[in-house]
Amino acid sequence: MPAKVLINGYGSIGKRVADAVSMQDDMEVIGVTKTKPDFEARLAVEKGYKLFVAIPDNERVKLFEDAGIPVEGTILDIIEDADIVVDGAPKKIGKQNLENIYKPHKVKAILQGGEKAKDVEDNFNALWSYNRCYGKDYVRVVSCNTTGLCRILYAINSIADIKKARIVLVRRAADPNDDKTGPVNAITPNPVTVPSHHGPDVVSVVPEFEGKILTSAVIVPTTLMHMHTLMVEVDGDVSRDDILEAIKKTPRIITVRAEDGFSSTAKIIEYGRDLGRLRYDINELVVWEESINVLENEIFLMQAVHQESIVIPENIDCIRAMLQMEEDNFKSIEKTNKAMGIQ
């Protein structure tokens, strides 16, 4: 029997997770929810998803009916049929859903990176914490930036012990569909204090990095991708070739070369379009080969993170771990990647 997955919040993350679940042969989407009758709600129905109203209120149901969008009921009409819920709600709403819906109905749930690490049993990355999250009820898939950092640090740590990491994050201002968030013409410290929250978020996945990782971040007026500059000190001697080989062996990381035309995040997104990727998603972390350098025992590199899609395969693996569908994290990763057509 395929695992029954409910997507609560058919937005930027939710619609991608719904499509990714539909690509797997061991799970299925039993429903998706929306809070308002917008074009995304209409498209969900047109794609064949059963639509439910996220807010259990008859007046809210009537809004959908008046808009001509058929709904199957509210989330309370489907919640107990689900083996697991993937929460795609906006920041802070996920915790409310956890306390008000998921826990009272005793259904497993995955929250996203906008929620607090302390609000769940554990924090998920397929490479680092799959086994820890195995069979747990309430887990958070960490944010896009943290996911990218976890992947690259896994690659480096596979060949040398990490002594410390110093990372500068250049964050996109907003997603492409966000017409409210800025800045439009500024570079904004985010936060103005150092360190930023990204280091502790990595530690929530990899506790052994406590005291070893420090991050700072700024926001720039772009919508396409985040970019990271890493300076990682390791214990022992490694070469540039060692690092490049480790990166290429790590799943969900791809390398690109500026000399091949990948001169910016815009070119990476264009690559996704030319590949025919749905929504031009780049689920893989992208590392520039030319940026990789080693000075004594310190590694330098630059990487790009597609914030809308990097966490999607992680959600799929998290479903398998929590529902105890596959014990081996690498087998789950391989299965997910093959179904989604990613590396």
UniProtKB/Swiss-Prot annotation:
Enzyme Commission number, as recorded: 1.2.1.59
Record: residues binding NAD(+): 12-13, 114, 172, 307
Pathway: Carbohydrate degradation; glycolysis; pyruvate from D-glyceraldehyde 3-phosphate: step 1/5
Active-site residues, Swiss-Prot/TrEMBL: 144 (nucleophile)
Cellular location(s): Cytoplasm
PROSITE patterns for the chain: GAPDH
GO BP, sorted A to Z: glycolytic process
Gene3D superfamilies documented for this protein: Dihydrodipicolinate Reductase, domain 2 (3.30.360.10), NAD(P)-binding Rossmann-like Domain (3.40.50.720)
Annotated transmembrane regions: none
Domain of life assignment: Archaea
Annotated D-glyceraldehyde 3-phosphate binding sites: 143-145, 198-199
Subunit relationships: Homotetramer.
Family: Belongs to the glyceraldehyde-3-phosphate dehydrogenase family.
HAMAP family, alphabetized: G3P_dehdrog_arch
Record protein name field: Glyceraldehyde-3-phosphate dehydrogenase
